[in-house]
């Protein structure tokens, strides 16, 4: 079976993880690298690449529908909420660390960084959360693979950079940094999770379904439901995180929408029962909308649309 993947080091590491798990189940695979729009246009912010929605996913969907690959491997946080019905997410792998990590030039923690320190990130959510937590800091866009980002930090172009902890774990890199609390830095929905997609009703679907991790699927589904009515795609300042409690009777759920400047926030932070958790998550998602979350998300999209037009003018 052919596994389609992006060509970055991280994407290849994730695809190789899936290949290894399938081989343990007796399924032989090969990798096929697909270049996505998110990979091609690294000279502009991610939100300026086809509005950022599905920038790392769309081309893999297309080649799968054409029958050129059997399996696609994604960072689940990059996947749009609305998916083609013929391309189900057949397996959600066991989740890695879902939190953000701050790496600083000289090891200084976030609370001790000097005013006007420059923080690099490609995520509008992380940028907004930093502005809310430390409005005296400066955020700048940071694109490129993990190697490139770390090199720019070492060169002193940034005082700190924000990354997903899971990405470093999958690369096998142990770097000392500060894990940011989800109470202040609610992660992107499904962060730290690998999703595996196939065409429906195929041999690949049957094989891949054996890799599904039930608890991770439950948590990621709750996270998507919480923010499903907000719109905005995976690039707007939206966080969502669901954690199954040790007693397995409750989930701790957090979700928030921020303005791009971090000055406004609408959020929830509650415990909900596992039984009926899907319906309760829908209720909380509706509450986010009525509290003004949809308005904030729409305003962010409008601003991003204007910025994208300006950016595209520069690249014509």
UniProtKB/Swiss-Prot annotation:
Pfam families: Porphobil_deam (PF01379), Porphobil_deamC (PF03900). Binds 1 dipyrromethane group covalently. InterPro entries: HemC, Porphobilin_deaminase_cofac_BS, Porphobilin_deaminase_N, Porphobilinogen_deaminase_C, Porphobilinogen_deaminase_C_sf. It comes from Methanosarcina barkeri (strain Fusaro / DSM 804). One of its GO terms (cellular component) is cytoplasm. Its EC number is 2.5.1.61. This is Probable porphobilinogen deaminase. It comes from the Archaea. One of its GO terms (molecular function) is hydroxymethylbilane synthase activity. Keywords: Porphyrin biosynthesis, Transferase. The porphobilinogen subunits are added to the dipyrromethane group. It catalyses: 4 porphobilinogen + H2O = hydroxymethylbilane + 4 NH4(+). One of its GO terms (biological process) is protoporphyrinogen IX biosynthetic process. The modification S-(dipyrrolylmethanemethyl)cysteine is found at residue 234. The keyword Aminoacyl-tRNA synthetase does not apply. Tetrapolymerization of the monopyrrole PBG into the hydroxymethylbilane pre-uroporphyrinogen in several discrete steps. Its cofactor is dipyrromethane. Disulfide bonds: none annotated. Pathway: Porphyrin-containing compound metabolism; protoporphyrin-IX biosynthesis; coproporphyrinogen-III from 5-aminolevulinate: step 2/4. Belongs to the HMBS family.
